[in-house]
Amino acid sequence: MFRPQVVGVTGRTDLGRAVRVAERVCRLCDREGFEVLVDDSLGIGEYPRVNLKDMGKEVDMIITIGGDGTILRVSRITSEYEVPILGVNLGKFGFLTEVSESGLKEAVSRLARGDFNLEEHRKLRIKIGGSDEGDALNEVTVITSRPAKMIRYRLSIDGFELETTWADGVLVATPTGSTAYSLSAGGPIVEPQVECSIITPLNPFKLEARPMVVSMDRRVEIDVDDPERAEVVVDGQEYMNLDGTVSVTRSPNVARFIRFGSTYFERLKEKFLRWD
C-alpha cells in the first residue's frame, strides 16, 4: 500500500481563495504528520518552499488547488516524475479533480491512512520539426493563428499520407482529453484506460473529414502548407510556433491521479451525462 510521506502543495496564484485553501491544506497535512513542501509561487512562508519543477522530484505526491487547468499545468511541468496528483476543485467544472474544499479534512485523513487508489492516464509526446516539446495530457492542437482563415494540412499515420484537408485546424487527443476540446469539436468520449489517440478535425471544409481513433502506438504527423499561418497549442495552455512537422506519439510518461473510490463513469455521468 502506497502511503506518501512528503506532500507538495501548489495552486492558482492569481486566485486569493486558492492561496487561502493551500494554507489550510498545509496545516491539515502537517497535523497528519506529512512533511510539506510548498510551491514558492504561492508565497506561503511557514513551510519549506521549492519551485514547481523541482517539487516533482522531491515529493511523493502533489495536491493542486484550482481546477482542471491547474492539474494540466502541474502534470506538464512535472511530467517526467509521474508524481501522483490530488486535485482540489475551486472551479466550475473540475472533471479531473477529486475533492472539493469542504472535503479537505477527510481527504487528508485518508491520505494518511493510505485509503485511496491510483489511476493512471496515458500521455502523448510532441515533437515539432524533430525537436522534443514535452508531453500533453489532454491534447495537442494545430490551429490557424488567424481567426476565420483556414489552414491546409496533411495528416499521415506511420508515414502513410492519409488525407489533405482545409480546416481551422486538427487536434490529437488522449482518452483523458476526449472529454475536453475534442468533445466540443465532435470527437468521441473514450475511457482513459483505452490506449489510443483521437484525431479530430476542427471545422473541416469537407463532409468526409471525420474524427478517427487510432492506436496510441501509431505515429501521427501533421504538416501545414503555410506554417506561418498556424500555431501549436498543448493542453490549451502552451503556445508554440509551427517550425516543421508536428509528430505525436505515445509518451513514456503517465499521469497518476489519487482517487477515493469514485469511478470514471460516475464522474462522467455527474459532469456530462445528465440525460435522466
Curated annotation (Swiss-Prot):
Its cofactor is a divalent metal cation. The active site is at residue 68. One of its GO terms (molecular function) is metal ion binding. It holds the Pfam family NAD_kinase_C. One of its GO terms (biological process) is NADP biosynthetic process. It catalyses: NAD(+) + ATP = ADP + NADP(+) + H(+). Gene3D superfamilies: Probable inorganic polyphosphate/atp-NAD kinase, domain 1, Probable inorganic polyphosphate/atp-NAD kinase, domain 2. InterPro entries: ATP-NAD_kinase_N, ATP-NAD_kinase_PpnK-typ_C, NAD/diacylglycerol_kinase_sf, NADK. Its main location: cytoplasm. Its EC number is 2.7.1.23. The keyword Transferase applies. Keywords: ATP-binding, Cytoplasm, Kinase, NAD, NADP, Nucleotide-binding, Transferase. It is found in: Cytoplasm. It is an enzyme of class 2 (transferase). Signal peptide: none annotated. NAD(+) binds at residues 68-69, 73, 138-139, 149, 168, 179-184, 237. GO terms for cellular component: cytoplasm. It comes from the Archaea. Involved in the regulation of the intracellular balance of NAD and NADP, and is a key enzyme in the biosynthesis of NADP. Catalyzes specifically the phosphorylation on 2'-hydroxyl of the adenosine moiety of NAD to yield NADP. PANTHER family: BIFUNCTIONAL NADP PHOSPHATASE_NAD KINASE, NAD KINASE. Belongs to the NAD kinase family. This is NAD kinase. It comes from Methanopyrus kandleri (strain AV19 / DSM 6324 / JCM 9639 / NBRC 100938). The gene is nadK.
